[in-house]
């Protein structure tokens, strides 16, 4: 009976950690993922932004990000000379935490399957490595400015 209880607790904790966070709103600039809150905190570098309310309204260049457009997706254009924000690919992030580079990464419950995807370092909050479906997987929460 204890084994069944422990198994249930482990499975439920993994399921809860993989739930999508409805409060996070993603933004993309120069094919790099960030958050709307991150860019709002750096308004001086933003030239313009365009908000798409649903994945169906995304232009062709942003269709590959439709999986993170549950709450809409914002396309940000950064002013010339301000493109130097820290960035990291998910493969590099996996490598830093001892996880195989091609392993998907979870960001606020959204599964990023393509590990060549780049994210801005400013969006990163807590990073945890957890067991997910029998494999070590990186789980990332965004910084307090969502």
Report residues per predicted region.
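Short, small/polar-rich motifs associated with maturation and membrane association
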Residues: 19-146
């Amino acid at each position: 009976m204890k084994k069944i209880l422990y198994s249930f607790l482990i499975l439920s904790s993994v399921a809860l950690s993989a739930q999508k966070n409805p409060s996070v709103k993603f933004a993309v600039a120069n094919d790099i993922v960030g958050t709307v809150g991150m860019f709002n905190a750096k308004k001086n570098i933003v030239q313009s932004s365009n908000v798409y309310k649903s994945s169906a309204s995304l232009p062709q260049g942003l269709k590959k990000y439709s999986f993170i457009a549950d709450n809409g997706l914002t396309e940000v254009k950064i002013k010339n000379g301000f493109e130097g924000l820290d960035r990291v690919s998910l493969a590099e992030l996996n490598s830093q935490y001892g996880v195989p580079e091609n392993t998907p990464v979870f960001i606020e419950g959204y599964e990023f399957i393509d590990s060549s995807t780049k994210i801005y370092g400013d969006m990163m909050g807590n990073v945890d490595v957890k067991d997910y479906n029998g494999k070590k997987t990186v789980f990332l929460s965004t910084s307090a400015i969502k």
